[in-house]
Design a protein with these regions (language model features):
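Hydrophobic alpha-helical transmembrane segments
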Residues: 1, 70-85, 197-209
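Short, amphipathic, aromatic/basic-enriched membrane-interface segments that mark the entry/exit
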Residues: 1-4, 107-115, 167-168, 241-244
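Long, contiguous bundles of hydrophobic transmembrane helices that form the permeation core
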Residues: 2-17, 30-37, 41, 45-48, ...
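Membrane-helix interface "capping/anchor" motifs
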Residues: 19-29, 152-161, 293-295
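Central hydrophobic cores of alpha-helical transmembrane segments
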Residues: 29-37, 162-169
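Membrane-interface helix termini and inter-helical loops of multi-pass transporters
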Residues: 49-71, 185-195, 264-272
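Membrane-embedded alpha-helical segments and adjacent helix-loop junctions characteristic
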Residues: 53-150, 295-296
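Alpha-helical transmembrane segments and, especially, the helix-loop junctions at the ends
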Residues: 127-144, 149, 154-197, 207-216
Length: 296
């Protein structure tokens, strides 16, 4: 049994990857993959699958779905709210033309590189640097969706490739501000800075290079295979957007700037949550719109 369960996990992971490559609905694939693994843990290994504080129903089959309910409630109030806030902020940035202003300013010089996938790799490296000051993977992903995603689409990268890069930007939790790195340093009996410089960086740098190279070739291969990259970019450019001042391009970047300022790098005495940063900038932009147009 001790060998069977890990092997089952490997098989389910491979099958899930195959199903997603074959373009089966991702949510359904992940749901059933998780249910299979949880059911195996409950019925075959006799593991208590319920989180702390959740009372068992008396039947493991029901507890599987009680686990889903418990996780759903927790995620809806945490990551779920973050996704809704970031989605609303991104939609508002697009509606007022701020996202398009950012794309307009950045795309022209970036296109001179003559390779959208070089820009894609740079976006990945920027995201990985930002994770050192914004250690929340979900928070960083939402901020990059607002600021980086439209730029990558504008230079001709497919939405799938852009999201793949954003999704892996927080793949390595680097730096002394990371909770994982701090825990590892504590267990090892090292200062977090020493742990970061002497132990994390020697492993992280070659890993970053390897992932960046893989992104370049893998995303380019699948974009060419899908043959939808430039068609999508044309649709983005052709979409009618409001005419706004050039300085509106700053607004999508402001939440990231605020998160960097109110971090251990600059002002460590004040902490700013990702959602709070989004709402703060949102309110500021509404006030600017009221002054400029007398309409939000």
């Amino acid at each position: 049994m001790s060998i069977f369960l890990p092997m089952l996990g490997v098989v389910v992971t491979i099958l899930a990857g195959w199903a997603m490559i074959r373009r089966y609905q991702t949510h359904i694939v992940l749901l059933f993959s998780g249910l299979i693994l949880v059911a195996a843990a409950a019925f075959l290994a006799g593991v208590d699958i319920l989180p702390k504080g959740v009372k068992p129903s008396g039947f493991a089959g029901f507890d599987i779905f009680n686990l889903l309910v418990s996780i759903g409630k927790k995620q809806a109030s945490g990551i779920g709210f973050l996704i809704m806030a970031a989605g609303g902020f991104a939609a508002y940035m697009e509606r007022i033309g701020a996202a398009n202003a950012l794309v307009r300013i950045t795309v022209s010089p970036l296109r001179k590189l003559n390779s959208p996938y070089i820009v894609l790799v740079l976006g990945y490296l920027i995201g990985q640097l930002l994770v050192m000051v914004i250690p929340s993977a979900a928070g960083l992903a939402m901020l990059l969706l607002v600021a980086l995603y439209p730029i990558l689409k504008g230079v001709g990268v497919s939405p799938a490739a852009a999201v793949a890069v954003i999704g892996t930007s927080a793949g390595m939790t680097l730096g002394p501000s990371s909770g994982t790195a701090n825990l590892a340093a504590k267990v090892a009996g090292l200062d977090p800075i020493i742990y970061f410089v002497q132990y994390q960086l020697p492993v992280a740098i070659p890993t970053l290079i390897a992932v960046a190279v893989c992104h370049y070739f893998v995303q380019r291969y699948y974009d060419r295979k899908g043959d939808d990259v430039y068609q999508d970019a044309d649709q983005v450019q052709a979409k009618e957007v409001p005419s706004v001042p050039v300085w509106y391009a700053v607004f999508p970047l402001l939440p990231i700037a605020l998160m960097i300022i109110f971090s251990k790098l600059v002002i460590s005495t004040v902490k700013l949550d990702t959602i709070a940063a989004l709402f703060l900038v949102w309110v500021l932009v509404i006030l600017v719109e009221l002054i400029r147009l007398r309409s939000p």
